[in-house]
Amino acid sequence: DLSVYDWKGKDIGCLVENEGKEIRLFFEAEIPPFGYSTYCIKKKEAGKKEASESRFVLEGNKVNKQEYVVENDMYKIVFDLSKGGTIKSLIAKKEGNKDFAGKTEKYALGELRGFFYEEGKFRSSIETPAKLTVVRDNVYEQKIKIEGEIASHPFTQVITLTKGTRRIDFDLTVDWKNNVGIGEYKEERWRDNRRAYCDDRFKLSVLFPTDLHSPRVYKNAPFDVCESKLTDTFFGSWDQIKHNIILHWVEL
């Protein structure tokens, strides 16, 4: 067993998990805005009680065969496995328990969607049920793996919640069976102004519909941050370009 101490010699508590031949150590670090913090890892003294933060807590809660709940101190998220593992509810506890999952019937939060022009139609991950596996569930981190399909192509999505962090991490991998065509149509007229790859609505996308009134959008551009005044960013030809290039992030 291990213990973690801060620079004052205080035992701050930790959690150790075994991963095969390796171990993973979790602890909550405090770092100043400008500077660094030093921590010491020692073997736990014999007979010493564990700090309260070292307990396994917040185990994932199975709602029913179609839904699964993942929860930490920041969020409570309900995944709908019958619809490709999309997010049915996303409650932000620090924002007055507001549910940020869009209550629309058109799209789902976290849905994969694109126009497969060889089939002549849109395909979506909600067409196929998904499988959910709990990868990690402790006081510091909740991590799940969702396995589903879009148009028979399998995908894996790993979603991570970290204690005290507003960010939700998504890691998506699609295992393409072949070189499938996704877009408005197969481009053949390269001298035309209109191009098949311009309109984002037909591209492979991850959808994040939100239930916001009078939203404002800020975009991270090189050396600047811009507030968008556009109703949308859809265009079909290169001479009608709208600003849809993001450097790192979008704030909504």
Regions found by a protein language model. Name each.
Residues F34-G35, K43-E45, M74, E141-K143, ...:
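Generic ordered-secondary-structure signal
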Residues V57, S89, A108-E111, K131, ...:
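Acidic/proline-rich low-complexity IDRs
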Residues K94-E119, C198-D200, P209-D232:
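Acidic glycine/proline-rich low-complexity segments
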Residues G164-F223:
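Acidic (Asp/Glu-rich), glycine- and aromatic
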